[in-house]
Amino acid sequence: MSERPGTEGRNPRAAGLASFTTREILELMNDEDQTVPAAVRRAIPAIEKAVEAIVDAIARGGHVLYVGAGTSGRLGVLDASEAPPTFGVEPELFYGIIAGGDQALRSSIEGAEDSEWEGRRDVAKAVRAHDVVVGISASGRAPYVVGGLEGGENVASKTVAITCDPSSPLARAADIAIVVEVGPEVLAGSSRLKAGTATKLVLNMLSTAAMIRSGRTRGDLMIDLRATNAKLRDRAVRMVRDVTGLDEDAARTSLEANGWSVRAALEADRQR
């Protein structure tokens, strides 16, 4: 049997879990969750390197490919899917690839993560020059993800790993290894818990910081958001109102005249 990954360890605080009350289970989970932000904080130097690589890639016309399996794959697809409405970018700028394809977003595809060859093939079909390939695997041992990183290494400008195990094959294979050591889970091996939370936090940081550094915001305002529903149109009105000093009706009129583009409305006001 191969060496047990750190994500498969037993948490001594959960040894008596079967006898815990509901309140005790919830408090233990909450206690464990509170250790995650500190673990992410320790990984910021590597996260910073990854963000700078992504910013450089985007400036050169590159894209970001997230590759994962199971929970890790779903989190990658989630982050990628939020980039267009949040930052007004094309859907391909951040692109999620998950073992087993789109069906795996809703249900478990048994064995999908076990094929290194399929990971290599799927990424090789999608990757282009100047892209950054981000492999996501809590254990760092999912063959599909390791293969995916290898599939992009000869084409992509950089490869990045997000994992919880510093000695894993994924960490060793990447140009930049983001290692968030969260320790064993309340349920041994259930990496959808702390490891999943850590992964989501890291992905938030990668895409958000990269977009800020790429000029897709104005300060803390999402001026390139796509105002496709009532909530987002109200948000757009507030942004234009707050920046320009226009009243709400004038801000809305300006947005309507500029196709509901906050950036265009602000530029129109600047030129008045």
Model-found features: residue ranges?
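Gly-rich Lys/Arg/Thr-decorated short loops/hinges at beta-loop-alpha junctions or inter-strand turns
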Residues: 28-36, 96-106, 218, 233
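Short, positively charged patches
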Residues: 8-12, 48-52, 63
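Short, amphipathic alpha-helical interaction segments embedded in low-complexity terminal/linker regions
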Residues: 210-272
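A short, well-structured juxtamembrane/interface segment
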Residues: 42-57
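Short, basic, glycine/proline-bearing loop/turn elements
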Residues: 32-42, 107-108, 132-135
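Glycine-rich phosphate-binding loops that contact phosphosugars or nucleotide phosphates
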Residues: 64-201, 210-214
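Cofactor-/ligand-binding subdomain signature composed of acidic, glycine-rich
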Residues: 1-39
